[in-house]
């Protein structure tokens, strides 16, 4: 249901951080489970779409939580790109000048990386690190993501970064686009809905980053362009959304982020999905439908 309430501003979202995070707690210790009805509706949604659906969502003020397959492993896909940009901000941009560094790359590198809607147009000039962060989060540009991974020391730098923020599960092992193969038996390049949801919360609402870096990362997420048919489709139009999507083989289709209702506290939201067939298409209505259920339950 859409309302006519005033949409919260980006400035509001960028200043709510630490205060809102006081209710994040340590994962499950302070969580208040939501009603069984929403779990049943998520199960019905999963069956309707013949998929595996994983959900973690939490109202950071009340602690009320929805968890469905929240501790099962799912392919991470491009939701790692938020962690890559965050790691660059925290570990490489200490003097505030690293984001201005220009990185050069070849057309062959773009071709090898796969989907690259931004970097493909800047082969001749290269791009700054800041521009690469913007491209990989807002447009899910694979070349930009790989170049950031290269600066960080490779995919396993994301695993180390996740551990340093208190995430014991999330791991990255391969580069784009190989990391999206998403075989059901694979434990590499995976996360869980709870783990990645809480990591995003620590980055956007908590103190995992310095205030300047948190504001910059949040701004990129607020201006994401890839979730129009996923979270954005399922949430009321007047809710602010800072998120990152991802997708791969076996119908893997993810959306993770923070959303702000007009008159309420932030809600952490993580929806990860897979399907049984390798060539299954992404099921955006499944992700959007889950987001709608979570919004109705936790607002």
Label every PLM stretch briefly.
Residues 109-147, 155:
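Conserved catalytic neighborhood of penicillin-recognizing serine enzymes
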Residues 29-75, 294-297:
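Beta-lactamase-like hydrolase cores
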Residues 49-52, 146-205:
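Mid-domain, small-residue-enriched loop/turn segments at the edges of structured enzyme/sensor domains
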Residues 67-70, 128-132, 139-144, 176-184, ...:
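Flexible glycine/proline-enriched surface loops and loop-helix/loop-strand junctions
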Residues 58-60, 107, 137-140, 175, ...:
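Active-site-proximal beta-strand/loop segments in catalytic clefts of secreted hydrolases
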Residues 63, 75-105, 136, 269:
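Active-site SXXK
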Residues 50-52, 69-71, 79, 100, ...:
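Extracytoplasmic
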Residues 2-19, 34-42, 151, 199-228, ...:
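Structured C-terminal helix/loop/strand segments within mature extracytoplasmic catalytic/sensor domains
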């Amino acid at each position: 249901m859409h309302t006519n309430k005033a949409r919260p501003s980006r400035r509001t979202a960028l200043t709510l951080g630490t205060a809102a995070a006081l209710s994040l707690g340590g994962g499950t210790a302070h969580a208040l489970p939501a009603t069984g009805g929403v779990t049943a509706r998520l199960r019905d949604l999963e069956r309707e779409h013949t998929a595996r659906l994983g959900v973690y969502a939490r109202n950071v003020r009340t602690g009320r939580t929805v968890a469905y397959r929240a501790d099962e492993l799912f392919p991470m896909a491009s939701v790692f790109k938020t962690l890559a940009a965050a790691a660059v901000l925290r570990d490489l941009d200490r003097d505030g000048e690293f984001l201005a560094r220009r990185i050069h790359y070849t057309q062959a590198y773009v071709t090898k990386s796969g989907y690259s809607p931004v970097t493909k147009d800047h082969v001749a000039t290269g791009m700054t690190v800041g521009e690469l962060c913007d491209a990989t989060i807002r447009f899910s540009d694979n070349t930009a993501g790989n170049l950031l991974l290269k600066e960080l020391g490779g995919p396993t730098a994301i695993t180390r970064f996740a551990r340093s923020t208190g995430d014991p599960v999330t791991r990255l092992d391969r580069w784009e686009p190989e990391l999206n193969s998403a075989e059901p038996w694979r434990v590499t390049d995976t996360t869980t809905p709870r783990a990645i949801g809480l990591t995003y919360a620590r980055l956007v609402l908590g103190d995992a980053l310095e205030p300047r870096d948190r504001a910059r990362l949040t701004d990129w997420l607020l201006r994401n362009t890839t979730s129009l048919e996923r979270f954005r489709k399922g949430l009321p139009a007047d809710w602010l959304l800072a998120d990152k999507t991802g997708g791969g083989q076996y119908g893997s289709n993810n959306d993770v982020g923070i959303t702000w209702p007009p008159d309420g506290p932030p809600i952490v939201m993580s929806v990860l999905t897979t399907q049984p067939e390798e060539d299954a298409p992404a099921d955006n209505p499944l992700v959007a439908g889950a987001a709608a259920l979570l919004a109705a339950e936790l607002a």
